[in-house]
Amino acid sequence: MNTRIRKLVYTALFAALTAVGAFLRIPMVYSSVTLQYLFTAMAGLLLGRRWGALSQAVYVLLGLVGLPIFTMGGGFGYVFQPTFGFLLGLIPAAWVVGAVAGESLDPKRMALASLAGLAALYAVGMPYMALILNAYMGKGMTFSALLWAGMLPYLPGDAVKIIVAAGVCPVLRRRLRLADGSDKRGECPCAIQPNRLLKF
């Protein structure tokens, strides 16, 4: 398959998988435990930083224009949901995962990359949640209450997602021919020569 087409197909695939992951959930108070970050981490590990981040940007943009692919629907009004920051955070999270993992097939390196991406996700999501809950909705929640609302209960599930992503992605990269001939900057590894990698 043509390299450009293959990358676009995988980008669309991971945008769709992230959407599906939104509905595989366990409801909580302000958010839900979902499989979204599993697919975000896999996008960064399999597609590289740029294409991985693009897949998540496509997902977020499609939800903002009205497709009901977020946990509680879609549309621009979703920006006023306390959890929207976590959706935005999927984009830099995938970028960080791809940047840290680079071309490595080492599961430990992939786990570290996924952990770094998770930190990026919370770095965007938690301040956004605090802003909406306290400044917009007037909840007046303390720092510890925010941690329990948006992060601490989710960490065990996040750990499982990181382990799964780091376990399956080395095999998938080889089977999908995504591990041959990467450049040195965390781009998508592809089965072509490095000087022919598609840039955008």
List the model feature ranges, each with a label.
Residues 1-55, 65:
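Hydrophobic transmembrane alpha-helices
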Residues 3-14, 36-40, 82, 86, ...:
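Residue-level signature of transmembrane alpha-helical entry/exit and packing/kink sites
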Residues 13, 20, 77-123:
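Short helix-perturbing small/polar motifs within transmembrane alpha-helices
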Residues 21-33, 60-93:
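Interfacial aromatic-anchored transmembrane helix boundaries in multi-pass membrane proteins
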Residues 46-50, 96-104, 171-176:
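Structural signal for the C-terminal ends of transmembrane alpha-helices
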Residues 52-59, 66-70, 96-97, 121, ...:
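Alpha-helical transmembrane segments and their lipid-water interface positions
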Residues 104-183:
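Membrane-embedded alpha-helical hairpins and interfacial helices in multi-pass inner-membrane proteins
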Residues 188, 194, 200:
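Cationic, low-complexity basic patches in intrinsically disordered or flexible, solvent-exposed regions
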